[in-house]
């Protein structure tokens, strides 16, 4: 058992509750086993219409409207405020171990993956590389020959997924073990669970493939949404469940063995006069917080539900375009105004940090010693204290945003920027 992991960057059955959350049961079912058989812009989650395509100017507007904070500020936007002055200084908070600048641009959702002492990365040109975690040296590389959606890795298996639905299982050294072909495009990185490889297609299908040979164990299809994000919310697993964020602010818990839904819940209700105003997809990966599963919806709410049955624990009207982070006690959100807030169970705000507005803050991650790590659109990594939200340290990686949240491994973090820089940072 390896614990919880996330992959590396989205007309319902709602019954409104007084607190703004809603529940639905019995509207989703597992399908029989299926046979195994779009390059986005540099933005975190380009919105796209589903198979029931929107026509005219709405469809064009959807294709051009990203959710990334960068997109909210054109060239004529006001400059962001000066960075908060670090309280301690860079050398005491985090330290750059190495940088590898030999890659090409990385799409949003391209996250490094760890396998033993190696770090696997992919880039927009379809190049796959295995780097040494010690110094960033290239140990092995090859061209995938097609557009990549993402990868996942552990000490036993590396899985590479192409956007056309080709899934390849590799050894930790890069030798191909198996290949499976899906009948749909993929825009999200896979997830490696102890017992299966989990892949999500752009049409809302979740498939569990055998780790040993790539055959399909089960397939489950979400109800079709008229409008949804091109890049789906990453999936999260625990011992026997996979949690999936869906359009219309829904969360579903699937049995990892059979793909049968255990529960599903909508954490927000769709409001607004237009399709874009009613868009409330889950943003970022859901996070496990003790015995709760927490998530945030774009133009919606942040909420936590019980993992056992999906019952609402708490909910608050607070939107985000990047996502949340959590540990067993606290939840951190970058709200729609890019104010960073720490929330306690129940949704109350402990502190607010507004020194990073208009900087395109990434999804944060919680690192050892109760600190918060995140990037911004100017290529900087910042480290905050979770006790009071004060800035502890900041270092520059390059001049572009992160492709995904930082990847943690003990007291080290690995990042990949949209310009292709791979960097290792010591958090001590």
Feature locations, PLM:
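Bacterial signal peptide processing site
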Residues: 71-74
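Conserved beta-propeller blade signature
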Residues: 119-120, 158-159, 197-198, 242-243, ...
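Blade-level signature of beta-propeller repeat domains, shared across WD40, Kelch, NHL, RCC1
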Residues: 402-428
